[in-house]
Amino acid sequence: MKNFFFCSIRFLVMASIICLSTTTKAEYPDKPIRLIIPFFPGGTTDQIARTVGTHLSRAWGQPVVMENKPGANGVIASETLVSSRSDGYTLMLVAMGHAINPLIYQKLPYDTDRDFTPITLLAKFNQLILVNPNLPASNVKELIALSKIRPLTYGSGGNGSSQHLAGALFFSMAGIQGIHVPYKGGSQAMLDTISGNIDMMVAQPSSPTYVSSGQLKAIAIATKHRSPDYPNTPTIIESGVPKFESYSWYGLVGPKNLSPQVLNKINAETLVVLNSENFKNLVSSLGGETAGNTPAEFSKFIKDERRRYSVAFKNTEINLNQ
């Protein structure tokens, strides 16, 4: 009888501990969150990541620690994310390279569709043909004519970056030769375009003042229709290169197998960020538009982007390893 009594007491104590631990389980997030940025500090990507991170930190009362891991068009950063726990405490900002890396690299150390959890598309940005102001070309026709006299150099943030893709696609569709000059970041390529070390880029200006101040010359925009931000800048299509359209974008992902509760919470709070005046003003000042969608919609968007560029590459002569 005595043993039965003590066994009963032990059972009740253990049951109480289990119930207490269940009811007092901390709600996500209860510790700092790590936000990986696959590019060097500075530039559009960094500004977007830090704006999102600052808002999430204030909303959740937990630090969001930024960690820049540049290299290999986002592959190095992606490896870090893939090896992290699927608990929502490690997230990553992604750009176009995330979608098209499977087209560039024969073997990746991860599966883009299976090893990540898409959270939401953050923003999309118009791209322009930006040239050094001393380049003797004020429109696409003059640029094409100049390229037939000498090959033009175009810069990018690295092989497979949005600037590389847009530049390679433009030269191929325009039927002219260009020399790709990859940099460790898009902002470095932009500064070298300003200084005249390279001729041009196809990119969104990391600072609109570069164009308004005359440090860069915008001769065409890579959208279907003219942009209200650059009303006097013709599209590349109307300038004589049919069907040319290009843009850059940024999104947020986590490792695979995020729980629905954590995923939905991150998505919901990130959408609050995107609807804030602070974020809208930042994106607008950089020549872009805020986005925001569901995890399922962003997953489809990533696959559609890869399919879009896959078709474009098959129809043009592009070597992305150059």
Where are these regions (language model features)?
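N-terminal signal peptide c-region/cleavage motif recognized by signal peptidases
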Residues: 21-23
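N-terminal (or domain-start) structured segment
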Residues: 26-114, 151-153, 159, 175-202, ...
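Extracytoplasmic/secreted proteins, especially bacterial periplasmic and envelope-associated proteins
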Residues: 47, 51, 55, 76, ...
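C-terminal lobe and pocket-closing loops
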Residues: 124, 207-275, 304-307, 321
